[in-house]
């Protein structure tokens, strides 16, 4: 279907608006469409019925992965992620936009460089990946403030409500962000097909109006005013029906919800609690939104991990390949057709962008690791499932039925959900009745087929389901005109090539399977041993039974070749689409899917294309890898791998075979301990000579924070003064009267924060932090103070990000950072006058390239010494491995060169060692803050930094702040640069984002 012209879209939008109901909300006009059909007038490219979306009139399954571009600040690597997601068999990515990174100052929207959205859109289009845009304004996402910029703490209104001050505060951001998204809509030739207004608008409390339909409508109208014309889709936090179509004002076009059924108990990864596998999603969908396709906008693909947690490898163990097998097939049993996995690639909470409930890594235990690696078994297992769905269009029109036990199998230990096709083609999802069972269960299937009701296996042997496993058995499955009456082995994919068809089946270890094909032809084994294979004719069908083997067998029945694989072997197979022209595949359609070939290629196959007689494969390798091409196009004569011609042979079955040799290159990394380290005391504020006259006076008698009243004479909430990120430093001046004996202070910086206090140059003590503690009370004994003498209390606080705001009305995002209360014995609280600082300039932040959150308030940060080429020549020598002999904060900087080989993707890590002392460190790499280490809290000790932030062939600048919170000081036990397996890659060059070097900052103090 043709794209609508800009004029046509404008005209139809005007018609739709003219037919709408208008009413007023706090001075703003709300547009409510009384008839959902009116929304269709905005565009006719993305449509839907009760079963699925249609794009350009073709029914489509959206298999999607969540990716946040802001968690990988190297735009030239975004295409790498899209390649790896497309290789899974996915066709879509969902993404958040983080408001806090784009409007650090009210009214000053900046989306440039690493924050620009257009390169993300361009990369998606090049990879042939559709996009679901989720700009918020609230996103949650385990980011600081849930995506709300810190200055919203000063808004005199309830967040995520119809309060006018809040709505006005969002207008500029949404107008700009949504406009950028609008330009990338499919109606403009871009990849964006759906738009999600708000995010998990699913809970309220505390007397605030919730749900507020007018608020939701306002959010949608903001997007429409910015020229968003694609359908609105929601992500209710649970299947509760909020804002579902037909619910009136604030209703979205398509209802969707989230689900994290296994939770986040990464400390106990083998525990699958009773009752956590959903079994009622289909029923709820029919109750809540029966006219729209069943949509899971966020389904668990990993888990977050808090400070002090067990680490993300444990989170992967919790949500691993067994989870994906059981839970994702269960989701398919409900007929899901928009299916987004959160997260598919997690990334990194660099530059203070995370919330206090998490640390620097946002690996999430995702299918793709933080280092963009695809070696996790979950990645491969999901690839098998996604390619099956892609090859099975009849899934989208099959009708899910009720969960059963004892109906389709001969045992009550198994449960089966059928999806019955209106035309031939049904699917039977089998799992353990006790979904967490780790037992292997033998069974026979009882299936209705076109050949009658059958008990399977019909030949010898029994079927088995291993523990924590699930299968989809197909019945009357169409392989280009050949009817697969049933298969107990799972389908990976099928293709029709010139002269024959190929069906790829796989099974688990020690399993027996059976396949029936409607055919009058005989069974011929054309590759592999016939050991363990039996076959017979029965009526107009042939039946084949076999034991799963790690050795491939190929059987031929007529023009159908059936590849019999074990699951681990199937992991090495890929199904790239061949572009009709050029080298990019374009968006998937039934036509492009039919053009696919099947390739066995090991670690990663990014894509394939045909150039005359040359078949080109673009792939990555982490070992010497045999390559096979199944279904090479007619006319293809030569094989090229990553641009290099590769010799190949062709066997009797037409399969091309070649091999890529892998020889790991020599990787030479500098010893960080041997660098020429320079040291600077970055806490000069405790010295008697320090001048804080340029600092902000904390003299507001009232806070603008409506959430928490003051317990101090003037506000000491950092956001009242424009400081929202990183370290905070306070200096309190008073004149002693000689009666002071102790000082009490309550500080707040979010979970796992720390604080330290000095009186003049005398260290009083620290709150060293705990994973559970968002704030801390400390009382410090004072020596006799001299009456009439001026004293200064210096307080350093680690702000680990602002809280999220999930529940409307709780206003948790407004939980302040800084000093909540204090008491100096013998003095009135007003006797102390305070000054404070955070990042230089606060909301007028200095580094526009790295954004508003990257820097905190340390002296070295305010000066910009964490950037490349600091003026360190005159600094004294000193290493973080020598550290500090007393409490304080040191700053260390050094440089080193890298010369890593081109054509290799080499994951690099900065490792701090397992040091449990009360010390905190910040890691800066070429000016980007890429790690916050907290020894006594943990768990993260290893910090991956991607190419682009690190210059793999050039000079790099590394800086560390080291904060000793105990009286005996602190040092790093170790500090090393390491790597893991180099990957020979066909990706191409990685371009570094801007890395502004040090320049003297005007007004720096």
From Swiss-Prot:
Report keywords, A-Z: Carbohydrate metabolism, Disulfide bond, Glycoprotein, Glycosidase, Hydrolase, Polysaccharide degradation, Secreted, Signal
Q: Name one GO molecular function term.
A: beta-galactosidase activity
Location of the active site: 200, 298
Query: Any signal peptide, and if so, which residues?
Result: 1-18
Q: Which reaction does it catalyse?
A: Hydrolysis of terminal non-reducing beta-D-galactose residues in beta-D-galactosides
Predominantly, its location class is: secreted
Assigned GO CC terms: extracellular space
| Subcellular localization(s) per the UniProt record | Secreted
- UniProt xrefs under Pfam families: BetaGal_ABD2 (PF13364), BetaGal_dom2 (PF10435), BetaGal_dom3 (PF13363), Glyco_hydro_35 (PF01301)
Gene Ontology biological process terms in this record? lactose catabolic process; polysaccharide catabolic process
The UniProt entry, under InterPro entries, shows: Betagal_dom2 (IPR018954), Betagal_dom2_sf (IPR037110), BetaGal_dom3 (IPR025972), BetaGal_dom3_sf (IPR036833), BetaGal_jelly_roll_dom (IPR025300), Galactose-bd-like_sf (IPR008979), Gly_Hdrlase_35_cat (IPR031330), Glyco_hydro_35_CS (IPR019801)
Give the SUPFAM superfamilies listed for this entry. (Trans)glycosidases, Beta-galactosidase LacA, domain 3, Galactose-binding domain-like, Glycosyl hydrolase domain
Which EC number(s) does the record attach to this protein?
3.2.1.23
* Carbohydrate-modified residues: 156, 373, 402, 453, 478, 522, 622, 760, 777, 805, 914
Question: What pairs make up the disulfide bonds?
Answer: 205-206, 266-315
Residues annotated as binding substrate: 96, 140-142, 199, 258, 364
Q: How does activity depend on pH?
A: Optimum pH is 4.5.
PANTHER family, per database record: BETA-GALACTOSIDASE RELATED
Query: According to its UniProt record, which protein family does this protein belong to?
Result: Belongs to the glycosyl hydrolase 35 family.
Task of the protein: Cleaves beta-linked terminal galactosyl residues from gangliosides, glycoproteins, and glycosaminoglycans.
Question: Which protein is depicted?
Answer: Beta-galactosidase A
What organism does the UniProt record list as the source? Aspergillus oryzae (strain ATCC 42149 / RIB 40)
Q: What is the lineage of its organism?
A: Eukaryota, Fungi, Dikarya, Ascomycota, Pezizomycotina
């Amino acid at each position: 279907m043709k794209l609508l012209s800009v004029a046509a879209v404008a005209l139809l939008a005007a018609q739709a608006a003219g037919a709408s109901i208008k009413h007023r909300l706090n001075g703003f006009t709300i547009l409510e469409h009384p008839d959902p059909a009116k929304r269709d007038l905005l565009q006719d490219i993305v449509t839907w019925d009760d079963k699925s979306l249609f794009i350009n009139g073709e029914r489509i399954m959206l298999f999607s992965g969540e990716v946040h571009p802001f968690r990988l600040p190297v735009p030239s690597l975004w295409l790498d992620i899209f390649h790896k997601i497309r290789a899974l068999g996915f066709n879509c990515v969902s993404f958040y936009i983080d408001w806090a990174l784009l409007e650090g100052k009210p009214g000053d929207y900046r989306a440039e460089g690493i924050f620009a959205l257009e390169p993300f859109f361009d990369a998606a289009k090049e990879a042939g990946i559709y996009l679901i845009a989720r700009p918020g304004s609230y996103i949650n996402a385990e980011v600081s403030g849930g995506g709300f910029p810190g200055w919203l703490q000063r808004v005199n209104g309830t967040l995520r409500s119809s309060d006018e001050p809040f709505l006005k505060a969002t207008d500029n951001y949404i107008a700009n962000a949504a406009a950028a998204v609008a330009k990338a809509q499919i109606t403009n030739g871009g990849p964006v097909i759906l738009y999600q207004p708000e995010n998990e608008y699913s809970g309220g409390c505390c007397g605030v109006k919730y749900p507020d339909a007018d608020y939701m409508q306002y959010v949608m109208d903001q997007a429409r005013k910015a020229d968003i014309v694609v359908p609105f889709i929601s992500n209710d936090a649970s299947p509760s029906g909020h804002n579902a179509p037909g619910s009136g004002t604030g209703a979205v076009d398509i209802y969707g919800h989230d689900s994290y059924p296994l939770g986040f108990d990464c400390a106990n990864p083998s525990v699958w609690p009773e009752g956590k596998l959903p079994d009622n999603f289909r029923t709820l969908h029919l109750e809540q939104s029966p006219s729209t396709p069943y949509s899971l906008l966020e389904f668990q693909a990993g888990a977050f991990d808090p400070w002090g947690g067990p680490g993300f490898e444990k989170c992967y163990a919790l949500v691993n390949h067994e989870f994906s097998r059981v839970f994702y097939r269960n989701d398919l049993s409900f007929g899901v057709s928009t299916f987004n996995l959160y997260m598919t690639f997690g990334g990194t909470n660099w530059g203070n962008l995370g919330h206090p409930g998490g640390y620097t890594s946002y690996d999430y235990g995702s299918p793709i690791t933080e280092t963009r690696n695809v070696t996790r078994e979950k990645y491969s297992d999901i690839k098998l499932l996604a390619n099956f769905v892609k090859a099975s269009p009849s899934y989208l029109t099959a009708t899910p039925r009720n969960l059963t036990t004892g109906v389709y199998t001969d045992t009550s230990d198994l449960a089966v959900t059928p999806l019955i096709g209106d035309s031939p083609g049904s699917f039977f999802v089998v799992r353990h009745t006790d979904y967490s069972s780790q037992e292997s269960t033998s069974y026979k299937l009882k299936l209705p087929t076109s050949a009658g009701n059958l008990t399977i296996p019909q030949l010898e042997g029994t079927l088995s389901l291993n523990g924590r496993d699930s299968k989809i058995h197909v019945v009357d499955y169409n392989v280009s005109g050949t009817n697969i009456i049933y298969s107990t082995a799972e389908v990976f994919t099928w293709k029709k090539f010139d002269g024959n068809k190929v069906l790829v089946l796989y099974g688990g270890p020690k399993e027996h399977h059976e396949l029936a094909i409607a055919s009058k032809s005989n069974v011929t084994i054309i590759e592999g041993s016939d050991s363990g294979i039996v076959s017979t004719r029965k009526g107009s069908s042939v039946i084949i039974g076999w034991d799963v083997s790690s050795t491939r067998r190929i059987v031929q029945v007529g023009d159908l070749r059936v590849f019999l694989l074990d699951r681990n072997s199937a992991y090495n197979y890929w199904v790239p689409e061949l572009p009709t022209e050029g080298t990019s595949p374009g968006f998937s359609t039934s036509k492009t899917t039919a053009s696919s070939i099947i390739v066995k290629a090991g670690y990663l196959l990014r894509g394939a294309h045909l150039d005359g007689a040359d078949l080109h494969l673009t792939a990555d390798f982490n070992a010497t890898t045999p390559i096979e091409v199944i279904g090479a196009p007619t006319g293809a004569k030569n094989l090229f791998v990553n641009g290099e011609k590769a010799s190949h042979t062709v066997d009797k079955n037409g399969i091309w075979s070649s091999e890529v040799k892998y020889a790991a290159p020599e990787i030479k990394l500098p010893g960080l301990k041997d660098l020429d380290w320079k040291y600077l005391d970055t806490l000069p504020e405790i010295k008697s000579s320090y001048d804080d006259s340029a600092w902000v006076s904390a003299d507001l008698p009232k806070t603008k924070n409506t959430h928490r009243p003051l317990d101090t004479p003037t506000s000491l909430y950092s956001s009242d003064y424009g400081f929202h990120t990183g370290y905070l430093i306070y200096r309190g001046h008073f004149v002693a009267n000689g009666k002071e004996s102790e000082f009490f202070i309550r500080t707040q910086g979010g979970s796992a924060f720390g604080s330290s206090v000095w009186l003049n140059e005398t260290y009083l003590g620290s709150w060293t932090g705990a994973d559970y503690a968002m704030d801390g009370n400390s009382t410090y004994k004072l020596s006799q103070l001299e009456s009439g003498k001026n004293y200064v209390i210096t307080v350093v606080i680690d702000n680990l990000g602002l809280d999220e705001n999930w529940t409307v009305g709780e206003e948790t995002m407004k939980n302040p950072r800084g000093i909540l209360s204090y008491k100096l014995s013998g003095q009135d609280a007003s006797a102390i006058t305070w000054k404070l600082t955070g990042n230089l300039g606060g909301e007028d932040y200095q580094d526009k390239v790295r954004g508003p959150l990257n820097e905190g308030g340390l002296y070295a940060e305010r000066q910009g010494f964490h950037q490349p080429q600091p003026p360190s020549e005159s600094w004294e020598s000193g290493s973080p491995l020598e550290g500090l002999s007393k409490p304080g904060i040191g700053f260390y900087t050094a440089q080193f060169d890298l010369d890593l080989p081109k054509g290799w993707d080499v994951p690099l890590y900065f490792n701090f060692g397992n040091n449990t002392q009360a010390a905190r460190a910040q890691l800066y790499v070429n000016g980007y803050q890429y790690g916050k280490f907290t020894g006594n809290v943990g768990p993260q000790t290893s910090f991956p930094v991607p190419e682009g932030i690190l210059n793999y062939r050039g000079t790099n600048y590394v800086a560390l702040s080291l904060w000793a919170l105990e009286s005996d000081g602190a040092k790093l036990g170790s500090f090393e640069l390491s790597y893991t397996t180099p990957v020979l890659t066909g990706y191409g060059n990685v371009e570094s984002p801007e890395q502004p070097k040090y320049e003297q900052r005007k007004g720096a103090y």
